[in-house]
Amino acid sequence: MTKIYNLAILPGDGIGPELLQKDLNFKVLKEQYKLKINTTEYDIGGIAIDKYGKALPKETLDGCKESDSILFGSVGGPKWQHLPPDQQPERAALLPIRKYFNLFSNLRPAKLYSTLNHLSPLRRDISEKGFDILCVRELTGGIYFGKPKGYIKNIIDKKAFDTEIYYASEIKRIAHIGFKLAQNRKYKITSVDKANVLESSVLWRETVNTISKEYPDVKLSHLYIDHAAMQIIKNPDKFDVILTSNLFGDILSDECAMITGSIGMLPSASLNDSNFGLYEPAGGSAPDIAGKNIANPIAQILSIAMLVRYTMKLPMISDHIESAVIDTLKKGYRTLDIANDKEKYVSTNDIGDIISDILKKRI
């Protein structure tokens, strides 16, 4: 019997709705690849605050529970920045979903395409070497979720505090993910910590070293976070899989994204043990360009490719989607964010249609 995939679609705010409108609409996957896909749309983020008074309504969470995975757009914008931090869309919508579904593994690929080499802020002699980095970030532990935390204002010298806590079991499970991914790439993994200062990083390094013995074919190296940040700028081509904690991964994955030249090209997947995932573009809601039909949908489309690879377990189809994106770029099609002064750019809708047409021809 053909598997039926039920997907929760969460467009959110800003450019999210228009990008998910051009997400191939799953039409190609349904018609050309004969996949059985049901999609249901739910409100999240600022638009949900306006309608329901909260960023993550019960109806949305219940819908996600009934789904095989989530395709997410973006949340947030100036309209809701006056709210207390724990009620703002970015924090009140995403963090509870990550915690509820135990989405402990965040995968953020950062690839510099040869056709877009000129966009990288790196020196030309560095960018010309290219790079293809996969950041594997532990997503549900560490300082973002550690207790106690607080902000004490009713004293002369105000103070605030957060707690970085990791259990060995949390480190083990993300380490296994990282090593297995490295086995499907270049058999090389770099673990990033601050073991010269932080006790949590001492445990991190000890645990990763222990897990590495189960993967003798993968070469493991360690870097401190400050040195890793420097080396990503200096020698990005030397990296393959980067394995790191929640806080450090938050920083390094954005650094890797920006040296590609456009965050609008980069997808993201957050997964649990059962292949349930939240798939989203790495960029934000970009309210300044929302509704103008100029946003880059490629990150959203590549997020679908990740969904097909990791939840549906159909790597060949995922490869086809990624190849269609590469061919589109080789043919010279660009959205505004990746076009230079001499190139004519196409709209959000147009580039989505072009990628779909190329994908159809691959079958």
UniProtKB/Swiss-Prot annotation:
Pfam families for this protein: Iso_dh (PF00180)
Intracellular or extracellular location(s): Cytoplasm
Site (described: Important for catalysis): 144, 194
CC cofactor note: Binds 1 Mg(2+) or Mn(2+) ion per subunit.
Catalytic activities: (2R,3S)-3-isopropylmalate + NAD(+) = 4-methyl-2-oxopentanoate + CO2 + NADH
Keyword hit for Cytoplasm: yes
UniProt-listed Gene3D superfamilies: Isopropylmalate Dehydrogenase
Positions contributing to Mg(2+) binding: 226, 250, 254
Key words of the record: Amino-acid biosynthesis, Branched-chain amino acid biosynthesis, Cytoplasm, Leucine biosynthesis, Magnesium, Manganese, Metal-binding, NAD, Oxidoreductase
Annotated binding of substrate, by residue: 98, 108, 137, 226
Gene Ontology CC annotations of this record: cytosol
Principal localisation: cytoplasm
Pathway assigned in UniProt: Amino-acid biosynthesis; L-leucine biosynthesis; L-leucine from 3-methyl-2-oxobutanoate: step 3/4
HAMAP family in the cross-refs: LeuB_type1
Name by which UniProt lists this protein: 3-isopropylmalate dehydrogenase
